[in-house]
Amino acid sequence: MCLKRKGIFSIVASMGLVAGCATTAPAPEGPEPPQNLLGSTDELQLITELSIDLAKTYGGDQVLVVLGLEDTLLDTRGDSNASCAGNRQSIRPKQDDAAKQVERMQQAGLTVIAMTSRGADCQDVTIRELGSNGFDFQASGFPAGFSFASSDGMPSYNQGVFFTTDQGEGPALKQLVESAGQPYPALIVVADNQQQHLNSVMKSISTSAIKVHTWRYNRAEKQVASTGN
């Protein structure tokens, strides 16, 4: 016994604060490893809040956020190549505060990129279109100097925007992440309006050491339902 009895035990001993008597609690081993997750929402703010929480848990450099362009960031009305095919209609954000939500994730230190099924021939138009709507992915994308080499008709990457050229989002994204090199992200968060795109990503990446959170962004369907069209 560490303390002698003098009428009563010292309250200090009962609190475990005396040298040699205190029990040392095991040091925390860090956060639980991330798990795969599937969800759906019509609100980018939800994806933003959850991604920022993930950055606090695992570190912003360990979380890659991939946001679909077509009918997720921009209202393309189902036509991914509308502005690239000579149609100069004004393209607006799908959600009024979309650029603000993206900026919040960027300020939290997350790696954030946009992903589109458009081809490399649409790079200039697409980046200009995003910029005119308040989006800038260059600073929050892969580090300066990163080069994703691909042949004509294959996926390409420019200024934080990934052009998959309809080659399959999952295999293309896996190739992009591997090309960026280690350290690989612990978790990839993907938001897109097309379930098949999300399924492709989940199938290609989720069985590796990298886990995936997929979010089906269904605002387009909600808008159609609300207008009765």
Language-model features: locations:
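Phosphate/oxyanion-binding active-site loops and adjacent basic polyanion-contact surfaces
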Residues: 40-43, 90-98, 122, 164-172
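A Trp-anchored, charged/polar loop motif used as the substrate-binding/catalytic surface
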Residues: 44-54, 96-97, 170-179
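Non-catalytic pre-domain segments flanking phosphatase-related domains
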Residues: 2, 7-13, 19-67, 84
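C-terminal cap/substrate-recognition subdomain and adjoining C-terminal extension
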Residues: 26-29, 108-110, 119-229
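N-terminal carbohydrate-binding/catalytic regions of secreted carbohydrate-active enzymes
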Residues: 55-95
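Ser/Thr-glycine-rich phosphate-binding loops at phosphate-binding pockets of nucleotides
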Residues: 72, 115-117
